[in-house]
Amino acid sequence: MRNLKLFRTLEFRDIQGPGNPQCFSLRTEQGTVLIGSEHGLIEVDPVSREVKNEVSLVAEGFLPEDGSGRIVGVQDLLDQESVCVATASGDVILCSLSTQQLECVGSVASGISVMSWSPDQELVLLATGQQTLIMMTKDFEPILEQQIHQDDFGESKFITVGWGRKETQFHGSEGRQAAFQMQMHESALPWDDHRPQVTWRGDGQFFAVSVVCPETGARKVRVWNREFALQSTSEPVAGLGPALAWKPSGSLIASTQDKPNQQDIVFFEKNGLLHGHFTLPFLKDEVKVNDLLWNADSSVLAVWLEDLQREESSIPKTCVQLWTVGNYHWYLKQSLSFSTCGKSKIVSLMWDPVTPYRLHVLCQGWHYLAYDWHWTTDRSVGDNSSDLSNVAVIDGNRVLVTVFRQTVVPPPMCTYQLLFPHPVNQVTFLAHPQKSNDLAVLDASNQISVYKCGDCPSADPTVKLGAVGGSGFKVCLRTPHLEKRYKIQFENNEDQDVNPLKLGLLTWIEEDVFLAVSHSEFSPRSVIHHLTAASSEMDEEHGQLNVSSSAAVDGVIISLCCNSKTKSVVLQLADGQIFKYLWESPSLAIKPWKNSGGFPVRFPYPCTQTELAMIGEEECVLGLTDRCRFFINDIEVASNITSFAVYDEFLLLTTHSHTCQCFCLRDASFKTLQAGLSSNHVSHGEVLRKVERGSRIVTVVPQDTKLVLQMPRGNLEVVHHRALVLAQIRKWLDKLMFKEAFECMRKLRINLNLIYDHNPKVFLGNVETFIKQIDSVNHINLFFTELKEEDVTKTMYPAPVTSSVYLSRDPDGNKIDLVCDAMRAVMESINPHKYCLSILTSHVKKTTPELEIVLQKVHELQGNAPSDPDAVSAEEALKYLLHLVDVNELYDHSLGTYDFDLVLMVAEKSQKDPKEYLPFLNTLKKMETNYQRFTIDKYLKRYEKAIGHLSKCGPEYFPECLNLIKDKNLYNEALKLYSPSSQQYQDISIAYGEHLMQEHMYEPAGLMFARCGAHEKALSAFLTCGNWKQALCVAAQLNFTKDQLVGLGRTLAGKLVEQRKHIDAAMVLEECAQDYEEAVLLLLEGAAWEEALRLVYKYNRLDIIETNVKPSILEAQKNYMAFLDSQTATFSRHKKRLLVVRELKEQAQQAGLDDEVPHGQESDLFSETSSVVSGSEMSGKYSHSNSRISARSSKNRRKAERKKHSLKEGSPLEDLALLEALSEVVQNTENLKDEVYHILKVLFLFEFDEQGRELQKAFEDTLQLMERSLPEIWTLTYQQNSATPVLGPNSTANSIMASYQQQKTSVPVLDAELFIPPKINRRTQWKLSLLD
């Protein structure tokens, strides 16, 4: 759905050359044009408008002096740096333009009618006057000469196997005689010059020749290969014209055919068979086709037509039409009308071989024109809902308009057509936000037709409905009407005949103001014209556009774009300069466009598409070259962009990687766009979408989510880009347009949680608005069913940073319950009968489904059927519930209501067999109420409720209750049901205590026994756990004798010593057994020096100090010294070995020997197909979900795992084992501080100063050694490696592998804690200053 838009015009008038031009050729490397006349050659530079060279062929005798000579071909030879010229008299001349030397390389006596070079310039073909073809090499060595007329079909002759012949086919009403009719051959067309026509395929492997057959007088097309072997001959085609052009891509050969009532362009295949056609918009014998020309990329077919003289008074015209194909339909995109009189008559034209869309035209009066076109999509530019998203496609004298807001029809179909008396060349839409549907059309007669959307009193005959029309259908579409046709008058009318496309880049900026650009024919300058409508009271249908003002620009303007919001107009020159045109200024100033830094903007390469857009707070120029390079101002942000469009605050682009990317420009910057579009950047979320190969953007429907793409063949595809969808939904939600948002989300499968998560407070405050707008029970139920606790604005649809969703977060409470309760309250207040099913859904959807309430409501419906017409019956409600809840679960909950009518109602709707549930229900009905409910609760495994009902059944049922309590561990719940003074309470307490004893929870068991009066069992429990204080309390309650207390005390002391509670054991011995001597010995054994001295002095046994206390202190000091020496030696040895191991690993890594990963439980980390944790580890570590895992057991497990590290030299994880050992040494030494402090005090007290200083010095040296070594052992590099987040929810096997390779270490993840250095607390007081 693209049009050809005139890019620029290069014009060189009145070239000073002798005679009349006859043909021309291009010198692409020099950028010059070679023109041949009856006198010789002339080389001109159309850019500088200078004559470079002039070579006379008359002086050398190659052309006659009387001017009757003719040049039939000119070809620039790149590798020979010369020009080859063929004359009609038969001479082939090689001309060097640099030296102006002429060399006749060959001569044909019968004359030459055609000279045609192969595309690779390796071969040249000459058609002679004797109807022969001569093929020569590029060095003009003859290869072969053959007759141009051949009797044979060619090497590709079709093979007939006997069936399927014409004689055996059905011929309809003509009968069998049609099979035997003689083929009637029509002679060549009257205006045919009978000259042969030659065309080459793009790769130079074949060429085709069109000649008039001497036998039949009709034209035939023959195909030859590069070896000059005839391949095929075309089938007989009546009225075949002389024009011939082989499509460069090699698929088809174009020619013309005159039919009884029309004139067609027909296409031949290489085998000579016809393959498709299209009809020219002329009557029979109205025009003749002089030539057909394909452009370099085979996308445009130029048709050179000339009027046939019918009336002497009429002035014949010459026309050049440009045709393109899309979706198997041929479009007439441009029509250039020249006069055949005087200097404006076309002599020759050709496409540029390098620039595909550049057409060169040579006119009779030494007038040269070069037109550059580019593809453009003409679409309306509004950004509000009133814009219909119109796209206009030029097709001859029709403009096909498709309204994408209401209809999406594939081309060549359209919504409606605009009909014109002349072919259309340009279409432009009004750059006004509120009137963007109005359009203006410039046709080949330089008339501008203005169409406006609005009320029209009568049907417009120039507007014809397309795909939306039909008999008996009501058209719900606003079609435009022709407001007026304006004629543009030029100061020099001759200019229009010489250059039919005088005005280009037509832009409609205001309702009565047009901008257009023309180019100077004498210098590289451009002029911007202001076209304003002249007031005309006489003629309402026709008017005139006056050039109210003009502004000259030094340079060739190649693009002009306008921002409909800011009204900024930007010009682009051929050299890439960007200017801002102040069209509203009286002086019509033109100044350079500057970026935010104040520097002029200049595109590095000319851009064929330019747009204006606001990026952040800056208005920028966006440009796309024909080489897919995309620029923002003068910064190239991408080089793989195939199309782009600016809509509101979004920039949409399609890329060569078959993706469509959408960026929000509001908060974007050049760097973010460049990073997002770079090939190495991986886009996520709503930015990127995969599209079909070769897709291009057609338009974006404003205030909607539709993005229209066109495929290379021409068919359309409508996609809803996630970024556009979410942006539009957020706008609707901000405006409380819940219905529009809901319908869009439901259709495009957007998670409905976004309605709430976008702004929870606003939603909860407008629940009534939401329900009234949706107004559908099914839709509300759908919303309920999709609710989940997840915040989709953080997971699925992250909102822009500036979105209000970050300013208003979730209210306190459970999301699902909040929404369900809020909506249910509103629905019950509006119409509880209408929204009955939704109310039931709100109960079911809650975090803890309220099925009992739901069943109760259904039961109420059964008993009291509402009279409201919107109400649902109990049967319908129950049937709906069975879709939400499993029938067995619903049956169980109905049973839990103890309402047998409700149970029967649910059971009848289920698939249960009545033989299964009726006997059970009948049995229940016969039971006493409490025991019945107990039985139901036990059946439903609601044991807490069951024992509550059973406790009310009487003492005779207590044994059954106690057994259930023991089986289901319901002791705490059961104790709440009985009075503490009751026997049942005591029995349950004893059973509870025994249960705790079995679970090795001895202290709670003792407390439970003591509470219920079971003192003997309580004493046993306290003895087992070592709670000597409670044990003595229970002993007092049991009235123990003195001997019993002594025995109990010694037993307790023994258990406490086993638990290394020496102080507690000493206290028990002192109080119960009055054995203070044994108590002192226990205290000395436990290093409780001060407590031991207290007892010595309390009982005045100073002799014990000399006999026991002092020796114990000195022995302890020696032990501490030996321990410190051992720790210091171990620490130094491990540290030294660790440095050696690390150095060896670094050397191995540098040598590339660390590729193999150590075998072990983490080896699966490095496999692309394995999980992070191996199976055995998973089994051993995560299979305890049904058991109690204490912090201590987890710690012990980790400790056991670390012990797998071996300190054996050379082991794979030796460095980890050394780190583990060093950390353990440091921690053990740190834990000695308190013990050292206490022994230092008693050493000083008993005047053992030397031993105290020795111990204090040794401990201080050990701590300093370890503190100095910590940074060397636990280096920063190893800590960072361990802190790197290798694993996580977004990690993959490849990312984990890459992370580990970057770390250059094979450290298992489970041992990352080993890289955290142990802490040495300097604030801990251990040193005794008295010993300094």
From Swiss-Prot:
One of its GO terms (cellular component) is cytosol. One of its GO terms (biological process) is regulation of translation. Residues 1150-1208 are annotated as: Disordered. Keywords: Cytoplasm, Disease variant, Neurodegeneration, Neuropathy, Nucleus, Phosphoprotein, tRNA processing. Residues 885-1332 are annotated as: Mediates dimerization. It is found in: Cytoplasm; Nucleus. Pathway: tRNA modification; 5-methoxycarbonylmethyl-2-thiouridine-tRNA biosynthesis. The keyword ATP-binding does not apply. GO terms for molecular function: tRNA binding. Transmembrane segments: none annotated. InterPro entries: A-sol_ELP1, Elp1, ELP1_b-prop_2, ELP1_N_b-prop_1, HB_ELP1, TPR_ELP1, WD40/YVTN_repeat-like_dom_sf. Changing R1011A: Disruption of dimer formation, reduced protein stability and reduced interaction with ELP2 and ELP3. Does not affect binding to tRNA. Residues 1164-1177 have a biased composition (Polar residues). It is linked to Neuropathy, hereditary sensory and autonomic, 3: A form of hereditary sensory and autonomic neuropathy, a genetically and clinically heterogeneous group of disorders characterized by degeneration of dorsal root and autonomic ganglion cells, and by sensory and/or autonomic abnormalities. HSAN3 patients manifest a variety of symptoms such as alacrima, decreased taste, decreased sensitivity to pain and temperature, vasomotor instability, hypoactive or absent deep tendon reflexes, vomiting crises, and gastrointestinal dysfunction. Homodimer; dimerization promotes ELP1 stability and elongator complex formation. Component of the elongator complex which consists of ELP1, ELP2, ELP3, ELP4, ELP5 and ELP6. Interacts preferentially with MAP3K14/NIK followed by IKK-alpha and IKK-beta. Component of the elongator complex which is required for multiple tRNA modifications, including mcm5U (5-methoxycarbonylmethyl uridine), mcm5s2U (5-methoxycarbonylmethyl-2-thiouridine), and ncm5U (5-carbamoylmethyl uridine). The elongator complex catalyzes the formation of carboxymethyluridine in the wobble base at position 34 in tRNAs. Regulates the migration and branching of projection neurons in the developing cerebral cortex, through a process depending on alpha-tubulin acetylation. ELP1 binds to tRNA, mediating interaction of the elongator complex with tRNA. This is Elongator complex protein 1. The lineage of its organism: Eukaryota, Metazoa, Chordata, Craniata, Vertebrata.
